[in-house]
A protein has these predicted regions:
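C-terminal catalytic lobe of FAD-dependent flavoproteins
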Residues: 72, 78, 174, 183-184, ...
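A short, glycine/Asx- and small/polar-enriched loop/turn
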Residues: 21-25, 52-59, 100-107, 241-246
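Helical element adjacent to the flavin cofactor pocket in flavoenzyme catalytic cores
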Residues: 63-120
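General small-molecule cofactor/ligand-binding pocket signal
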Residues: 41-44, 89-91, 229
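Dinucleotide-binding Rossmann-like beta1-alpha1 core, especially the glycine-rich loop
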Residues: 1-52, 58, 174-177
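A structural signal for short hydrophobic beta-strand segments in well-ordered beta-sheet cores
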Residues: 16, 98-99, 179-180, 252
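Central helical "cap/lid" subdomain
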Residues: 115-161, 205-206, 223
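Mid-domain catalytic core of redox enzymes
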Residues: 149, 155-185, 206, 218-219
Length: 258
């Protein structure tokens, strides 16, 4: 963040729990973090939580002092600019339509703005990653759009929020609604998780907002409608295993094409 001149604040993070089952998950999560070299992780009680951030919900928590917050919008732009400075090129409004394997093992990628010759293809197309895989001759990927809604709280609420507060992870290692202060002084509360109607389903619903208020109140004690200034929705891809129906967030693998 410093190198890219992106606002960053070292806040730490609380991953909170309410039940014995949550405590067991946090213990497992903490062991995994320590195995991965994360320093300073602690399981703390409510008294210690109040010292760190009395606005946080939960009966106990895993404290992660190395965590922080930054501006995700400026960070994304900075990464794009840095890539250009290092030789990357962007071809906008350029849809990938197919691929032809060359005799030397390289690939000719066909797009709506001409062909591109390459040795490697990195599929990071998100919601359209299954379409890209299909064009490359790799079937079997099914992507379902999952919608998540957020509330943006006024900076009057931000004065109470010192630290990002997340719930104990679910058994599949996903997280539900959390409360995160921003570098600008607001608070983001969300997301929820809904199966979207399609890849463009950005509509906010009253039922979802009511549910978000309830779940957000468990994370942030100052969740009050008087602080609400904006709500929005985003779509994230979930890969569905056709054989088992299992949901996967990320798939990292290397495949031969053709």
């Amino acid at each position: 963040a410093r190198e890219l001149d992106v606002p960053f604040k070292r806040t730490g993070k609380l991953i909170v729990g309410f039940t014995d089952e949550h405590r067991q998950r946090l213990e497992q999560f903490m062991a995994r973090g320590e195995a991965n070299g994360v320093k300073g992780l602690e399981l703390i009680d409510r008294k210690r939580m109040d010292e760190l951030d009395p606005s946080a919900g939960g009966n106990f928590a895993m404290w992660c002092p190395a965590s922080g917050i930054l501006d995700p919008f400026l960070y994304t732009i900075a990464l794009a600019e840095n890539a250009v400075h290092n030789g990357a090129e962007y071809h906008l409004n350029c849809a990938f339509t197919g691929e032809t394997r060359q005799a030397d093992g390289t690939h000719l990628l066909h797009t709506t703005r001409g062909d591109f010759h390459t040795r490697w293809v990195v599929n990071s197309a998100g919601l359209n990653s299954a379409v890209v895989s299909g064009h490359l001759g790799i079937p079997g990927y099914v992507i379902k759009p999952v919608k998540g809604e957020y509330f943006v709280l006024d900076k009057l609420a931000g004065q109470f929020a010192r630290i990002p507060v997340y719930p104990a992870p679910n058994p599949d290692n996903t997280f539900d609604t959390h409360a995160t202060p921003t570098v600008d002084g607001n608070v983001l509360v969300g997301p929820d998780s809904q199966l979207a109607r399609d890849f463009q389903d950005y509509e906010s619903t009253q039922a979802a907002m009511d549910g978000l208020i309830e779940s957000g109140s468990r994370m942030f004690k100052h969740m009050d409608r008087a602080y609400f200034i904006r709500n929005f929705a985003g779509i994230r891809p979930k890969r569905i295993d056709p054989a088992t129906g299992a949901v996967q967030d990320f798939v990292l693998e290397c495949r031969e094409i053709g």
